[in-house]
Amino acid sequence: MMRINSSCVLQSTTSLNARVLPLIGRVGTLELSSGQPLVFKTTTPKQQDVLRTSTVKAIGFAGSRIFVKTERGTQYTFEFQ
């Protein structure tokens, strides 16, 4: 399992879920492991949001970016800052 504790930003997603879209651009922690759900947690002074996806199918890295595809076909792009 890979855990990124800070300064990880959700850059983009193919998800159209109304609960996911507001998380784009937010900084949080990322827990990622192939064959397990992706977990992205963000915290603001007012609330904490947790994104938990379906099972991760593929993980890719390019520079400071992480590309994730779930078994349902949804894609997520994260960036270290």
Language-model segments: residues:
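N-terminal non-globular leader segments, chiefly Sec-dependent signal peptides
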Residues: 1-63
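Short, compact, well-ordered microdomains
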Residues: 57-81
